[in-house]
């Protein structure tokens, strides 16, 4: 299954996250629906520019040294530490004792790589494989073949090329109609570690879907998103994983995510 078919989105995954980079206040969520279909039925259409072109422009600026990093098409002049993610990646690198081989599901053109790399040990050899939609894969292969980034259309394709140490899903699973699909993929993969970050957790007793509203100053869009019950999600995963650490992203000064978003670093049960 490709990323495009898995996401079932009203809009591309990079667009789902783009406004967070430039709009500091949390997005607005309306409703609490038992099913994805109910939330999707209440979500409207969107109008936005060519996101790939904007992301590519930003990523090329980073590659050439004209920007420090890019977050969803917006470039930044100075490095910015994403402490929880860097800590998780550093832990994996130390635990595996070899090169750090990352499988980044929905990773655009390497935004997490470009932001994290300056803060990771320069002695760690990194390969960073990204699973994305076909247009991002094509752009990535054309423009970033001379970097540690590699681009694939499916997890299976990436796994056929090499084994990996960690599967990274940053701000992704809440926009999957069936998040369990990605959990199954993670379990079947070679990755002993699984990083879930920008993960929205609540203590409501059950999962629910809401309609996320993008601030009109960015663009007009509404789309469905899951909020996961913390205990229910952990019950779903704990048979296959043990928790290495659980970080509230609001403790990170540079977080651009609403309250309740966390990073989980999980290790497969031996």
Model-derived segments and spans:
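Membrane-proximal basic amphipathic "stem/tether" segments
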Residues: 1-46
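Class I SAM-dependent methyltransferase Rossmann-like catalytic core
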Residues: 43-98
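Conserved class I S-adenosyl-L-methionine
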Residues: 98-109
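Class I SAM-dependent methyltransferase SAM/SAH-binding core
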Residues: 107-155
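A short SAM/SAH-binding and catalytic strip from SAM-dependent methyltransferases
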Residues: 165-179
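A short, conserved alpha-helix within the catalytic core of class I
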Residues: 175-189, 196
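Conserved beta-strand signature within the Rossmann-like core of class I S-adenosyl-L-methionine
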Residues: 190-205
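Short alpha-helix
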Residues: 220-247
């Amino acid at each position: 299954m490709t990323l495009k078919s898995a996401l079932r989105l009203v809009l591309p995954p990079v667009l789902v996250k783009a406004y967070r980079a430039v709009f500091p206040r949390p997005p607005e969520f309306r409703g609490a629906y038992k099913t994805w279909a109910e939330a999707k039925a209440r979500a409207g259409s969107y109008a936005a520019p060519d996101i790939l072109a904007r992301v590519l422009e930003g990523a090329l600026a980073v590659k050439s040294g004209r920007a420090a990093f890019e977050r969803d098409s917006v470039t930044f002049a100075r490095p910015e530490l994403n402490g929880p993610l860097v800590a998780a990646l550093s832990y994996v690198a130390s635990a595996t004792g070899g090169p750090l081989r990352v499988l980044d599901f929905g990773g655009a053109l390497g935004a997490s790589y470009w932001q994290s790399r300056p803060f990771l040990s320069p002695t760690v050899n990194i390969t960073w494989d990204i699973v994305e939609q076909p247009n991002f894969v094509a752009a990535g292969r054309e423009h970033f073949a001379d970097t540690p980034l590699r681009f694939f259309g499916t997890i299976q394709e990436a796994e056929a090329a090499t084994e990996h140490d960690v599967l990274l899903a940053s701000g992704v699973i809440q926009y999957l109609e069936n998040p369990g699909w990605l959990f199954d993929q993670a379990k079947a993969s070679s990755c002993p570690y699984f990083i879930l970050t920008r993960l929205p957790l609540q203590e409501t007793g059950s999962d629910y879907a809401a309609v996320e509203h993008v601030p009109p100053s960015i663009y007009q869009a509404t789309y469905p998103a899951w909020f996961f019950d913390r205990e229910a999600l952990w019950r779903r995963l704990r048979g296959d994983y043990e928790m290495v650490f659980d970080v509230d992203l609001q403790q990170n000064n540079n977080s651009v995510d609403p309250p309740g978003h966390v990073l989980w670093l999980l290790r497969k049960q031996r």
